[in-house]
Regions:
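Conserved two-lobed SF2 helicase motor
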Residues: 2-31, 215-230
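Conserved Walker B
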Residues: 13, 53-55, 228, 244-245
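Conserved SF2 helicase motif VI
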Residues: 80, 239, 247-266
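Conserved interdomain hinge at the start of the Helicase C-terminal
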Residues: 129-182, 189-193
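Conserved helicase ATPase core of P-loop NTP-dependent helicases/translocases
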Residues: 188-228, 251
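A short beta-strand element within the Helicase C-terminal
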Residues: 221-223, 232-245, 268-271
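Conserved segment of the helicase C-terminal RecA-like domain
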Residues: 258-288
Length: 307
């Protein structure tokens, strides 16, 4: 049959559904000419497959390759790096090091700062671990704040002051900012609070249930690492304020990487660190080590803010 297109765009989810359906019941597909699962590429005359965000879903990507039969493939990723040694080993099997294009030194243009704040001696009710003495959980941290009216007001005040100082007061023409929170509840609370305090600009929330235009049209967007941490480009984005404490190298590089080089706007990535929470200090040290060769500079902004 004649094909009236040169490029096909298809999601991983759609392909995964096709693979599962074909493997479970291949007979209906054979009437369309798919005698084998790889015939998909022959029927649509696909000779070159490009896959973005190749660092995600390694198991699916490996299975994807087994079912792919084309002349050329190209996988794209800025963060084919893993903290877990087992995952790192598997990634080198799927994407052999000798087959990777080494572009050399990173284009280092992002200025990174750890924004430090502290807890008041009287602060009570904060939780930040999964269970008793478990791993750090930032969702738990945010939810414990939201359960306490005094803590909520104090935390919102800290975020407002940081946004004021690091974005509003020094904002370039048409410059935009992202504020990362971890939970839907905190995103809703912070976005409403900042819109009330900064009525001269548009503040939007952007999470999974929101319109994509929310991300692109506002001067200030409150979002989550899952919603806008990878695969999105915000025009004129100059400032990221990350309130979420994350250890993952891949996640930290991806979040900072939302800042694209712009000769008219400096790229600044700020992450919050509470000096009284051991996990925050540990993650701060890890981020400095992991980002040291990827960004322009890493510094510390010691504030008087207290929660």
């Amino acid at each position: 049959n004649d094909l009236h297109f040169k490029v096909m765009m298809i999601s991983n989810t759609t392909l995964d559904n096709f693979h599962k359906d074909y493997l479970a019941n291949p007979k209906p597909w054979k009437k369309y000419g798919l005698k084998h699962i790889t015939d998909f590429y022959t029927i649509f005359k696909i000779g070159f497959r490009i896959r973005d965000e190749a660092h995600e879903h390694l198991h699916f990507n490996f299975k994807f390759d087994l079912f792919t039969h084309v002349g050329k493939t190209l996988d794209l990723s800025a963060t084919l790096i893993y903290d877990d040694q087992g995952t790192e080993r598997i990634s080198k099997i799927i994407y052999p090091v000798n087959d990777r294009f080494d572009q050399g030194k990173w284009d280092t243009y992002i200025e990174v700062m750890s924004v430090e704040y502290s807890l008041k001696p009287t602060t009570k009710g904060l939780k930040w671990t999964q269970g008793f003495n478990g791993p750090y959980n930032h969702n738990q941290f945010e939810l414990s704040i939201l359960k306490n009216r005094v803590l909520t007001e104090a935390y919102l005040g800290i975020i407002r002051a940081i946004v004021q100082e690091l974005f509003i007061d020094v904002r370039a023409d048409n410059e935009k900012s992202l504020v990362y929170c971890s939970t839907k509840e905190m995103c809703s609370k912070v976005s409403a609070y900042l819109q009330d305090r900064f009525s001269h600009i548009t503040v939007n929330r952007y999470i999974g249930e929101d319109e994509y235009d929310n991300l692109l049209t506002a001067e200030l967007v409150v979002t989550t690492p899952k919603s806008a941490g990878t695969g999105v480009d915000v025009p004129n984005l100059g400032v990221i304020i990350n309130t979420v404490n994350i250890s993952s190298t891949q996640a930290n590089v991806q979040l900072a990487g939302r800042l694209r080089y712009n000769e008219k706007i400096a790229s600044r990535y700020y992450y919050l660190t509470c000096v009284n929470i051991p996990h925050h200090l540990k993650y701060d040290a890890e981020k400095r080590h992991k980002l040291r060769n990827i960004v322009k500079s890493i510094g510390t902004l010691d504030t008087a803010h207290r929660l």
